[in-house]
């Protein structure tokens, strides 16, 4: 079962919470303070945004910290306006028990640069209730992330 707006407000910890981001069946996550483009970590908050050049992969941190109960998971989709500009998002499930900011992977498939402004809504997350709590909720490598998290596979 997907959670409606009033249950999201009541049951899911989202910090900082924005009423404008709350949707009927989801929540619009905003561009946070860090990004990774062309091998460099960028301060998005200080610069006011991040530019993703054509044919370039990027990681973008969400402004929001999300904390999920052990019986709720998240499914994310890129906002359609950004897809129409050429962005493609590759997002994993957000497992039950997750707590932290999310690092999201984007690819600019277009021939034009795409700019994301700090605080701009860019991905919607929908929350899905499981039949019961997970026996093994998420407690993995990225739990508690507050900053951009690069892959831990290459370490």
UniProtKB/Swiss-Prot annotation:
It is an enzyme of class 3 (hydrolase). Keywords: Hydrolase, Nucleotide metabolism, Nucleotide-binding. It comes from the Archaea. It catalyses: dCTP + H2O + H(+) = dUTP + NH4(+). Belongs to the dCTP deaminase family. Homotrimer. This is dCTP deaminase. The lineage of its organism: Archaea, Methanobacteriati, Methanobacteriota, Thermococci, Thermococcales. The gene is dcd.
């Amino acid at each position: 079962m997907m959670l409606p707006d009033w249950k999201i407000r009541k049951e899911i910890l989202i910090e900082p919470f924005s009423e404008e981001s709350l949707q009927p069946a989801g929540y619009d996550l905003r561009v946070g303070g860090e990004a990774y483009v062309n091998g460099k970590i960028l301060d998005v908050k200080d610069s006011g945004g991040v530019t993703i050049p054509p044919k370039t992969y990027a990681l973008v941190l969400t402004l929001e910290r999300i904390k999920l109960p052990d019986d709720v998971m998240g499914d994310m989709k890129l906002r359609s306006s950004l897809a129409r500009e050429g962005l493609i998002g590759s997002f994993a499930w957000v497992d039950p028990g997750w707590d932290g900011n999310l690092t999201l992977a984007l690819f600019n498939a277009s021939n034009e640069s795409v700019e994301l402004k700090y605080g701009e809504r860019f991905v919607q997350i929908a929350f899905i209730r499981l039949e019961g709590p997970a026996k093994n909720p998420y407690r993995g490598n990225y739990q508690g992330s507050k900053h951009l998290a690069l892959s831990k596979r290459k370490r």
